[in-house]
């Protein structure tokens, strides 16, 4: 490594990059999909993230939630992760998850709250082959009811394999980020026409409906 003298150290600067906080929400039966999302995000950060000066940070309850007394578990997750997230990826396999105070499951509550906040929502349903012994008919009924509720809103995609899920997530996140960064640059340029002293925001609110560019 290189040792810098005081004069040289004074010139070292770290680049500030917009950060997209991406929440991962799912029941416990889609662990493979969570791993895929993390790999896709790593690839994005190493490719277009570097060229476009943006960093995607994934947030997942098992890694990013600290114990907190006095509140319901879902309220803690909402406070520590959801309220700070710019977008959410939700995945359903064969389970719908544990119920909360107000919704059928924690994942459904997180989807609903992000929609209410006007944030970006990506929802994926697995159609991968399943053993009969793993099928939960009650959960399946609830999942189908949830899909029926949102079918006209175009907020979800069905995938049939891990490879297809990987391709969907990579495509949707890439287009989402590039579109939002382009929109942010346009917003900044529009403002600077009237005020040359304005500085670009450190973080970008990433809100975009990917169904506008992808035909589900």
Where are each of the predicted segments found?
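Conserved catalytic or regulatory cores that recognize and/or transform ribose-phosphate-containing ligands
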Residues: 3, 8-216
């Amino acid at each position: 490594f290189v040792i810098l003298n005081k004069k040289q150290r004074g010139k070292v600067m770290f680049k500030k990059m917009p950060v997209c906080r991406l929440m991962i929400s799912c029941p416990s039966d889609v662990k493979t999909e969570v791993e895929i999302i993390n790999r896709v995000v790593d690839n994005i950060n190493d490719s277009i993230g570097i060229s476009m000066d943006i960093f995607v940070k994934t947030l997942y309850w098992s890694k990013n939630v600290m114990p907190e007394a006095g509140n319901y578990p879902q309220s803690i997750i909402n406070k520590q992760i959801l309220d700070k997230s710019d977008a959410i990826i939700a995945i359903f396999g064969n389970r719908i998850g544990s119920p909360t105070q107000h919704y059928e499951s924690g994942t459904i509550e997180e989807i609903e709250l992000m929609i209410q906040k006007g944030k970006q929502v990506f929802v994926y349903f697995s159609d991968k082959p399943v053993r009969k012994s793993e099928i939960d008919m009650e959960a399946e009924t609830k999942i189908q009811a949830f899909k029926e509720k949102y079918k006209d809103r175009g907020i979800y995609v069905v995938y049939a394999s891990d490879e297809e899920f990987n391709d969907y997530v990579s495509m949707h996140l890439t287009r989402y980020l590039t579109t939002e960064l382009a929109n942010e640059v346009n917003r900044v340029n529009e403002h600077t026409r009237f005020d040359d002293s304005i500085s670009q925001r450190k973080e970008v609110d990433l809100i975009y409906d990917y169904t506008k560019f992808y035909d589900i």
